[in-house]
Regions:
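Active-site phosphate-binding strand-loop segment of PLP-dependent enzymes
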Residues: 56, 68-123
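Single conserved hydrophobic/aromatic residue that forms the stacking wall/gate
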Residues: 1-5, 9-10
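Conserved beta-loop-alpha segment that forms the PLP phosphate-binding cup at the N-terminus of a helix
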Residues: 14-41, 49-52
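Conserved PLP-binding catalytic core of the aspartate aminotransferase-like
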Residues: 231-232
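Conserved active-site segment immediately N-terminal to the catalytic lysine
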Residues: 116, 130-141, 150
Length: 232
């Protein structure tokens, strides 16, 4: 907890949870814990955001307030003046879409609404301002460790007993926060391996260094594509 928290500059007002079920389970866990008004807004920029949007429809009114599906998710829509629902409990995004090669360069203007973000494919790849998010989560298999676990960073005031009726105990953020992510037998191997990566990240110089290294690696590919006559 301490290593990932220090690398991400997570303040005491957030909890770091090590949860099972992968990132896909969060598609249900988020509305179960947050959809108090039974309304949430989704920006659909790829298949993962689309799956989250479809899952949320089970629990309440999920509004698709922006999408790039008209051009096969090949761009991020303008999110500067979104039609945010007045009674929305949160606005949901998938921040990086590896299938389509798109990433938010600027977080959407949620007009004061809680921002929930799936950062699975860019987790711990660059510094972030955690205070811009209510919940930020990522499946560890992309950047951090073996498949089978998700790390969720949840603002403390969102961790309550006020969840949707019928929410299973294992699907409540509070039960995991109150038990140090060990309400049931934790994914010990994943946590151990993630710990190794956290220590390596720190030894390498932290997230600023990771950002620089990732940009240098990406430049090799994109420079080649820019100079290629085949790819336009």
């Amino acid at each position: 907890y301490g290593l990932v928290g220090s690398e991400m500059c997570i303040r005491d007002s957030y909890k770091v949870l090590f949860l099972q079920g992968g990132a896909s389970l969060q598609f249900a866990m988020i509305p179960m814990n947050l959809m108090k008004n039974r309304v949430a807004d989704y920006i659909v920029t790829g298949q993962w955001a689309k799956k989250a949007y479809q899952e949320a429809q089970i629990y309440g009114k999920a509004n698709k307030i922006a999408t790039s599906e008209d051009k096969t998710f090949s761009y991020i829509p303008d999110c500067s003046d979104l039609p945010v629902s007045p009674d929305a409990d949160y606005v949901y995004i998938c921040e990086n879409n590896t299938i389509y090669g798109t990433k938010y360069k600027k977080l959407p203007n949620t007009k004061g609404k809680l921002l929930v973000s799936d950062v699975s494919s860019c987790f711990l790849s660059e510094p972030i301002d955690i205070e811009q998010y209510g919940i930020l989560y990522g499946g560890v298999q992309k950047n951090i460790g073996p498949a089978g676990m998700v790390i969720a960073v949840v603002r403390e005031d969102l961790i309550t007993d006020e969840v949707l009726p019928g929410t299973p105990t294992m699907m409540k953020y509070k039960i995991h926060a109150d038990n140090g992510s060990m309400y049931n037998t934790p994914n010990c191997y994943d946590i151990y391996m993630c710990g190794k990566v956290f220590k390596w990240l720190k030894a390498m110089g932290g997230l600023e260094v990771m950002k620089q290294r990732n940009e240098e690696k990406a430049a090799i590919l994109y420079d080649f594509l820019d100079q290629s006559k085949l790819f336009k």
